[in-house]
Structure formats: C-alpha cells, structure tokens
Curated annotation (Swiss-Prot):
Chaperone involved in the maturation of iron-sulfur [Fe-S] cluster-containing proteins. Has a low intrinsic ATPase activity which is markedly stimulated by HSCB and ISU1. In cooperation with other chaperones, Hsp70s are key components that facilitate folding of de novo synthesized proteins, assist translocation of precursor proteins into organelles, and are responsible for degradation of damaged protein under stress conditions. This is Heat shock 70 kDa protein 10, mitochondrial. Residues 651-667 have a biased composition (Gly residues). Induction: By heat shock. It comes from Arabidopsis thaliana (Mouse-ear cress).
Length: 682
C-alpha cells in the first residue's frame, strides 16, 4: 500500500508564481529558510579560524578539485581568483608527510612526490564518501602509490607515515591551504566558504565534503555543483538561453543543462560519472608506457614505486603537451637498472597514439550527455551554448566529441580551471547579499526513496527535482500486529533496493498492533539547498515521529570530526611555530652579518676585551641558530646586540676621539651602527 501525499515540489512553472521568500536560502539574507541540515548552528560552534588576523565577513568560493584546487573572492560585483604563495592561480590537490613529520600541501608536496611516493597523497576526492569495499575503491587501490586502508567504520581511508587519514581530512588540509591563500590576500581571517562538488556526488559524498570544511575551520555556507558554478560565472554578464556545461576534470565528469533567464539560473537536468577524469587518462598512458618498457627491456616498472612515480609525472606532462603539439618526447634517464647496468626510458609519443589509448574513456562521456538532454526534455539543437570546464576539455579529441554530441563547436567563454571557483565566489556574494540580481535553482542528481516490500526501491523524489524540496508518501505495515518499521533510505536509479546506494536507516517504533495495511506511516524527505537529506517517519495514528539527517552508514562521527578539528589546529600551530623559527633564524643570520661587519670596521678602535666579548656572542648565536630552540636563539640575538652596543658606548666615551656611533652628535663620520635585527613577535 503506498498512497502518495505530496507536500510540496518546486517545479519550473512555480518559479513565477511562488513568493520570492520561498527561495530565501539563495537571497540576500544568507540564511537557508528551507535548510534542515544536521549541521546547522552546530557547525558554527565548532568552526575555528586558525589565524590571528582580524575577523572578516567574506564568503570565499573554493573549487576543491581532484587534481587542482582554486579559490576566489568577490571584489565588488565581480569574482577574483586569488594567487597562492607560489604565485599560481591553482594549487595542486596534493598532500605529503615528509620524514620530519611535516605536512606539505600543494606545489611543495607535488615537487617531492618522486622521492616520497608512498607518503604523498593525491586524488582523494575520488575516495571521499566511499566504502573500502566499493568496486571503484578497489580499482583506485591498484593505481595509486600510497596505501588505501579500511577504516573502523568500513570507509576507505589512506595511510601515510604510519598514520591513517580520512579523505575528508586530506580535503581539509587542501581547504586550509585555500583558506590561508584567501586570508593572505584579504588581510583578515576567513571562516565562511562556498565549496563546489561534482554534480553527480551522492549524499554521503556531499556530507564528507562538508565535514572537510568543518575540519579546516570553515563554515561551509553552501555546497554547489561544479557545472552550476561554472554557468554562474559565465552568465553573470547577462547571458541568456539554454546552456550545456561539459565538465571533465581530474577525477570526475559532469554534464548539466541550465536555462538562464532574467538572472535566474535554473538547472534542468544533470548527469555524470564520478570516476572518469584526467587521472584515468594518465593511468591509461602510464599502463602503455610500462608495457612498452617491459617489452623492450624485460623489466616491469610497475614493481618499482619510485620509477612508477617518475613515469606517472612524465605521463601527465606528455598528456598536457599533446593538447597543443602533435607529438612529444618522454625522456627519463636512469629510470631503473639491472645486472647489465642503468636503463633509460626514451619514447616519442604522437597525439594520434595518445587519442587511441584514451578513446574508450572519451566515449564514456556520450551516454551521460544524451541522458542529460533526455531528462531536460530538449534536443541537442536547442542548446544555445556549450561550455567547457575542467582541464581535460583542452584535449582536442574531447572538444571534437563535444562538437559531435551537441552539433556545435563548444564555447571558449570561460577559463576551464577557474570558472568553478569564480562561480562559487558569486554564490558567496549571493548569500552575503552583495549580488542580488542572480537566483540559482539547482537539482538533486539522483533519485531518493526507501526500500519497500520485496526489496523494491520506491522513489519519493526523482532525479533532477529542483531543490530545496520536501515530499511525503504514506506507507503501511507488511505484517499483522507489526509494532515497528525499519526505514532504509536509498539513492540511485536502479529498481531493486540492493542495487542502489544505502544512505542510512532508522526504526519507527511504538506502532499500535493492527492488521497489516491499517497503520498509516508517513515518510517525508526534505532536501536542503546543499542537496543534503533529512528523512522523517510519522505514525499518523499516534503522532510519533522518528527523524534523522542522513549520514552514510560509515562517515565521520561527531567525535571523529572534533578530533580532526583539533588535529588541524595542531598542524596550524606547528606550521606557525615552524615559520617563527625560520624567521628567527633569518634574523640571527642578518644579526651575525651586521655585527661582523661592524666589528671589522671598528676592531682597531676598541679594546681587545670588547672585541673578544662580541666574537664570543656571535659564536654563541651561530651555534644556537644551528639548532631548533626558538627561545635560545632569541636570547642569543639579544645578547649579541647587547655586546655590539659596547662599540657605541666606547666610541661615545671618547676613547677613539669620534662621536657616538648611532647617536645624534653632529659630524660623526665613524659611526658604528648596531646590528640590524627584526623582533619576531611571539
């Protein structure tokens, strides 16, 4: 028995007639009126800014990518991408732990990957929200140089330097880097962000991404889909019409169809593959190179982690070069060695050969595109513009496939690497109230429902329903005198419950004993603007209600998250202490140089005991600065400066007949300035 009781559904035809307050979660109030997420105010109480800078009210936009990440902020009515400390506009999504236990993020981490492959973690976005037993996880384990392990809750975690980390934790390290990049630019602390995710991410993956933000000390104001964010950045200049966004990034593929009209961005449909991206292209090329070397030299490089990492980086570089050239050389001297001596790897790779190797991957983008157009109820001819997003869309073969699918050349109107972050910053501007003329109506990518009698998946909310939304349906018991009902919440498109993703389960107890089919149990699904689901079950006879915000059967517990927040703060504190130590050592070097220069100039004019005292102080400072005791180095800097000040005291006393060095007397040419030094604040 399943009598539908529809509470509310936001559809296209309601956009005009519905009061604007119905979409308040996207308006200037910045508060989600339909938001029933479990996070709510609790996340704000635990979010901390790991910075001593003054608090700011900016909402930054972060594209947390599989391969690269990017951060942007609103300047007036326009989004601006912020360069990182290395001067780049994107940051590699790579985290490493070196032998000293130091945490490296971004370019420094990627740079040392060849010599430290097992402790350098990348591409963890593909693991976020996934189980260890997931077939995709098992596939990924064979491709990465680091260890993927089973967490106590059954999730897929990674291991580095003997310690286990959740993908959310690794994501948090990258988000922290993005946060610090924004803070350095703005000159104030940042605690709020809009973070993007692939449109085809399920609820567990969205929750895990939000957890990553929380661990990084960020209150994630909104999770938005990457293609939607790209469309926002494209459409902010009053563009209108039907837009298809083809987003092929480092690890995931999404395609969305949107209609832009009078500042309203309405997502009509979305589709994709969360395990298709640049990493798969790299791996296809890597397999080819390994096999080529095995054929010519009889050595399997797949068994040599260091050689494999060098080859992986060469494959990625070759892939990038072949987007703009017809052929490239891969030269890796001393890649390995055997009894006959050192072996070198040298091969010429043509674009046509590369395209042959990855053609099966490119072809996998066809079906999601066709299904997306079908769900949107339009033909390819009706699409006005096709936007390319993600670094992999620079591959000429990908562009030709897009042109073939949609019947038109794709637009180059957005930067494939930066459009998503810019759109996220725009959404932040909408939430803050700085951007009032844009309204975003997104959709849920997958159907949501429960398991009913016979193991059937009964949908309550179908895919591509505009969010936020809330729907209910009345069910009954399957047996006589049944006093409790188990509610299994699922997400997917298969007809049988076991073939779909189990998001969570709970029990409604205390149902009065009755014949089967008599009790009235109302199940309600509520999806907020982040795409996060709350499910409740109500016995209409007794009024008893059981409600949960969906957490995957794995996922991070509250204790896990708080522990990781503390660890993130500890890492931030260690980084701060390390920077202070380096700055103080630099000050010590400058002090030594200046004192020795002054001593050289005035040695003949001061008593030998003063010169000896200064030399001893410099020797002590040099010895201290070779160690890591911050307080000792500071004390020795102070002692050295006190010793060198005696030159000035002696000279001002008239012993050398000159005026006081560094003093205010007129005409003194032989002045001995004290050593330059910079006081490092604690």
């Amino acid at each position: 028995m399943a009598t539908a009781a529809l509470l509310r559904s936001i559809r296209r035809r309601e956009v005009v007639s519905s009061p604007f307050s119905a979409y308040r979660c996207l308006s200037s109030s910045g508060k989600a009126s339909l938001n029933s997420s479990y996070l709510g105010q609790n996340f704000r109480s635990f979010s901390r800014a790991f910075s001593s800078k003054p608090a700011g009210n900016d909402v930054i936009g972060i594209d947390l990518g599989t391969t690269n990440s990017c951060v942007a902020v609103m300047e007036g009515k326009n989004p601006k991408v912020i360069e990182n400390a290395e001067g780049a506009r994107t940051t590699p999504s790579v985290v490493a732990f070196n032998t000293k236990g130091e945490l490296l993020v971004g370019t420094p981490a990627k740079r040392q990957a060849v010599t430290n492959p097992t402790n350098t973690v990348s591409g963890t976005k593909r693991l976020i929200g996934r189980k260890f037993d997931d077939p995709q996880t098992q596939k990924e384990m064979k491709m990465v140089p680091y260890k993927i392990v089973r967490a106590p809750n059954g999730d897929a975690w990674v291991e580095a330097n003997g310690q286990q980390y959740s993908p959310s934790q690794i994501g948090a390290f990258i988000l922290t880097k993005m946060k610090e990049t924004a803070e350095a630019y703005l000159g104030k602390s940042v605690t709020k962000a809009v973070v993007t995710v692939p449109a085809y991410f399920n609820d567990a993956q969205r929750q895990a991404t939000k957890d990553a933000g929380r661990i990084a000390g960020l209150d994630v104001e909104r999770i938005i889909n990457e293609p939607t964010a790209a469309a926002l950045s494209y459409g902010m200049t009053n563009k209108e019409g039907l837009i298809a966004v083809f987003d092929l990034g480092g690890g995931t593929f999404d395609v969305s169809v949107l209609e832009i009209s009078n500042g309203v961005f309405e997502v009509k449909a979305t589709n994709g593959d969360t395990f298709l991206g640049g990493e798969d292209f790299d791996n296809a090329l890597l397999d080819f190179l390994v096999n080529e070397f095995k054929t010519t030299e009889g050595i399997d490089l797949a068994k040599d982690r260091l050689a494999l990492q060098r080859l992986r980086e060469a494959a990625e570089k070759a892939k990038i070069e072949l987007s703009s050239t017809s052929q490239t050389e891969i030269n890796l001297p001393f890649i390995t060695a055997d009894a006959s001596g050192a072996k070198h790897f040298n091969i010429t790779l043509t674009r046509s050969r590369f395209e042959t190797l990855v053609n099966h991957l490119i072809e996998r983008t066809r079906d999601p595109c066709k299904n997306c157009l079908k769900d949107a109820g339009i033909s390819a001819k009706e699409v006005d513009e096709v936007l390319l997003v993600g670094g992999m869309t620079r591959v000429p073969k990908v562009q030709s496939i897009v042109a073939e699918i949609f019947g038109k050349s794709p637009s180059k109107g957005v930067n494939p690497d930066e459009a998503v972050a810019m759109g996220a910053a725009l959404q932040g501007g909408i939430l803050r109230g700085d951007v009032k003329e844009l309204l975003l109506l997104d959709v849920t990518p997958l159907s949501l429902g429960i398991e009913t009698l016979g193991g059937v998946f009964t949908r309550l909310i179908t895919r591509n329903t505009t969010i936020p939304t809330k729907k209910s349906q009345v069910f009954s018991t399957a047996a006589d005198n049944q006093t409790q009902v188990g509610i299994r919440v699922l997400q997917g498109e298969r007809e049988m419950a076991t073939d779909n993703k189990l998001l969570g389960e709970f029990d409604l107890v205390g149902i009065p004993p009755s014949p089967r089919g008599v009790p009235q149990i109302e199940v309600t699904f509520d999806i907020d603007a982040n795409g996060i689901v709350t499910v409740s079950a109500k016995d209409k006879t007794t009024g008893k209600v059981q409600q949960i915000t969906i957490r995957s059967s794995g996922g991070l517990s509250e204790d896990d998250i708080q522990k990781m927040v503390r660890e993130a703060e500890l890492h931030a504190q260690k980084d701060k202490e390390r920077k202070e130590l380096i700055d103080t050592k630099n000050t010590a070097d400058t002090t030594i140089y200046s004192i020795e220069k002054s001593l050289g100039e005035y040695r003949e004019k001061i008593p030998s005991e003063i010169a000896k005292e200064i030399e001893d102080a410099v020797a002590d400072l040099r010895s201290a600065s070779s160690g890591d005791d911050l307080n000792e180095i500071k004390a020795k800097i102070e002692a050295a400066n006190k010793a060198v000040s005696k030159i000035g005291e002696h000279m001002s006393g008239g012993s050398g007949g000159g005026s006081a060095p560094g003093g205010g007397s007129e005409g003194g040419s032989d002045q001995a300035p004290e050593a330059e030094y910079e006081e490092v604040k604690k």
